[in-house]
């Protein structure tokens, strides 16, 4: 009598492997989704801090009179669509890739009062000065990090040292 030698995997073994791969894929997909959303939140916080830091630097330049193109808030920071010492037209925002400024409300950085955060404006950064008294104001930099939450930093402008 001959014994037949079988090689390969049984159907049960293949089904077990497929089930394990399916479980790993399901767990990995959920983990990746959380990773992406947390990365976007961190990107907005980093961008808000960077813009606030740039405003602080420009405020120092304006106070020192070092840069003739930066003598007050309007010439240093500017508004949507204007040229200024801050030159935010080249600002790169990996979360919101819309063009900065340009006179429309679609840019990655808006020079207007912040609106409620929604899915449509998640990733947008709003730069809003309070009412000026002379050339002194508080500038709020707010970033919508998700559809329902935001991160903001307030920066003094023109108060002097």
Name these PLM-found stretches.
Residues 2-33:
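N-terminal single-pass transmembrane signal-anchor helix
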Residues 9, 32-35, 95, 126:
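Aromatic side chains
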Residues 34-37, 144:
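Extracellular/lumenal glycan-associated surfaces
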Residues 37-66:
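Membrane-proximal N-terminal amphipathic helix
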Residues 57-161:
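Periplasmic/extracellular, small/polar-rich flexible segments of pilin-like filament-forming proteins
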């Amino acid at each position: 009598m001959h014994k037949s030698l079988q090689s390969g995997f049984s159907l049960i073994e293949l089904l077990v492997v497929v089930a394990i791969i399916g479980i790993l894929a399901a767990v990995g997909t959920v983990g990746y989704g959380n990773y992406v959303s947390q990365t976007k939140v961190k990107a907005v916080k980093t961008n808000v801090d960077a813009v606030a830091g740039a405003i602080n630097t420009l405020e120092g330049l304006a106070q020192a009179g070092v840069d003739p193109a930066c003598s007050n808030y309007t010439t240093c920071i500017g508004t949507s669509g204007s040229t200024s010492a801050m030159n935010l037209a080249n600002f790169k925002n990996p979360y919101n890739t819309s063009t900065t400024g340009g006179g429309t409300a679609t840019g990655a950085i808006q020079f207007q009062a912040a609106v409620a955060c929604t899915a449509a404006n998640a990733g947008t950064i709003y730069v809003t000065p309070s009412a000026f008294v002379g050339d002194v104001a508080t500038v709020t930099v707010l970033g919508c990090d998700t559809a329902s939450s935001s991160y903001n930093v307030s920066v003094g402008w023109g108060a002097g040292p």
